[in-house]
């Protein structure tokens, strides 16, 4: 996710240069006419999923087999940045050091935002699966997607906090590594999981966990992460000492110390950080001595943490997901950690596990960011100030590159700026 800019983008490289001779003053460009609207108050979220590839049951690197996503997807794709492309369904796809990664667009944080993000992710997964089905028929090989990881991203706007050494995104990530792992374990992990990570990514916080082949549990995990992270972001300090105020409400296992994240800077609550592997233990056994002097089960700890943040989780959750989170924490709905082993659905994503349209658009409309991006990816013209602009590319997730039809000049507009023109785009896109 790219940080939303509060000011319109400057003139892009490659635009027409001003002639040397005098000429009448030009009409201001759309992005120069007025400042972009203020970023949405709650920020944005996004989700990513990584998959390893099995070719005829053997693990392979996707870049070695397919070279580029453009050799899988038959429809034209808008280039995003680097080696990533936008799928017609709105997400981005790219190869990342031996895995295929699919990322959702930015989705503004609001009620039901995690359900929107989960829906977007699974729609893109199933689209890619269908394209791989066609590739199989053409090339005579079997291709399976094996779930590897899921990343839950929540934006962090530095301008929302006073400049303070105790309120950096790095300290926020470390603090969250002491809060998030146990409830995320119950919702997203399996018997072969090895850890839960939290990484500071400049303008966002990223929670990393195993891929979850159950869309409902994945959305529940995203909802819980949004509710907890947005609440903790409002704390007066991100120092670990703040946890001492809530030793019973926010139980931490005694002796727990996170380790550096394996892939990028950040922290991981790895199984080796605990006296016993929590991913293999019975989640209802009171095995864990906490810093508050109690002995609790994994489910009890996860339930207390969830209860503490329940008002914020409820604020951003849809009703179905809220009931599911509560049911898992109370033991009324199963956790994947209660199974003997990792389910086989992990190794055949898009076939053994699919998206059942849990949230149709009539029930949960697309977010405004999704609608803007959808128009852009389809190349639908936008008319502003009697000028027609055609989207031709993206700069990260936050900006759309347009070509003005009259003179083919290049213009870069932020998604926040384009929100002011969404109604015209919805009604007059061509």
Positions of predicted regions on the chain:
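Terminal catalytic/cofactor-binding subdomain
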Residues: 5, 10-11, 16-137, 146-148, ...
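Short regulatory "switch" loops immediately downstream of catalytic or recognition motifs
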Residues: 57, 157-160
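Inter-helical turn/loop segments and adjacent helix faces that build the functional surface
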Residues: 139, 159-165, 236-239
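Histidine-centered divalent-metal-coordination microenvironment in nucleic-acid enzymes
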Residues: 142-158
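Acidic, His- and aromatic-enriched active-site or binding-groove loops in soluble protein domains
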Residues: 166-184
């Amino acid at each position: 996710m790219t940080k939303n800019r509060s000011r319109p983008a400057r003139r892009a490289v490659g635009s027409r240069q001003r002639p040397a001779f005098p000429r009448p003053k030009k009409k201001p460009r759309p992005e120069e006419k007025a400042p972009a609207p203020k970023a949405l108050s709650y920020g944005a979220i996004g989700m990513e999923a990584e998959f390893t590839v099995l070719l005829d049951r053997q693990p392979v690197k996707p870049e070695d087999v397919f070279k580029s996503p453009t050799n899988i997807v038959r429809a034209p794709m808008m280039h995003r940045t680097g080696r990533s492309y936008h799928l017609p369904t709105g997400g981005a796809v790219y190869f990342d050091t031996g895995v295929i990664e699919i990322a959702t667009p930015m989705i503004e944080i609001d009620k039901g935002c995690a359900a929107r993000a989960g829906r977007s992710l699974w729609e893109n997964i199933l689209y890619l699966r269908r394209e791989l089905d066609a590739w199989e028929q053409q090339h005579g090989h079997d291709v399976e997607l094996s779930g590897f990881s899921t990343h839950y991203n929540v934006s962090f706007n530095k301008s929302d906090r006073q400049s303070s050494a105790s309120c950096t995104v790095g300290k926020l990530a470390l603090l969250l590594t002491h809060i998030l792992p146990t409830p995320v374990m119950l919702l997203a992990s399996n018997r072969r999981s090895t850890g839960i990570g939290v990484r500071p990514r400049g303008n966002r916080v990223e929670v990393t966990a195993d891929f979850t082949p159950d869309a409902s549990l994945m959305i529940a995990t995203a909802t819980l992460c949004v509710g907890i992270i947005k609440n903790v972001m409002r704390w007066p300090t991100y120092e670990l000492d703040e946890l001492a105020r809530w030793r019973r409400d926010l139980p931490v296992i005694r002796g727990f110390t996170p380790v550096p994240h394996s892939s990028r800077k950040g922290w991981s609550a790895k199984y080796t950080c605990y006296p016993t592997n929590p991913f293999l233990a019975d989640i209802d056994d009171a095995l864990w001595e906490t810093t508050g002097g109690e002995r609790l089960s994994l489910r009890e700890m996860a339930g207390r943490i969830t209860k503490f943040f329940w008002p914020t989780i409820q604020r951003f959750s849809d009703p179905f997901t809220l009931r599911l989170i509560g049911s898992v924490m109370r033991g009324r709905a199963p956790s994947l950690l209660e199974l003997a082993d990792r389910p086989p659905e992990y190794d055949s994503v898009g076939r053994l596990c699919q998206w059942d349209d849990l949230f149709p658009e009539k029930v949960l409309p697309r977010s405004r960011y999704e609608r803007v991006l959808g128009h852009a990816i389809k190349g639908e013209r936008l008319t502003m100030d009697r000028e027609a602009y055609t989207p031709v590319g993206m700069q990260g997730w936050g900006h759309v590159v347009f070509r003005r039809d009259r003179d083919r000049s290049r213009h870069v507009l932020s998604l926040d700026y384009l929100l002011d023109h969404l109604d015209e785009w919805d009604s007059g896109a061509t």
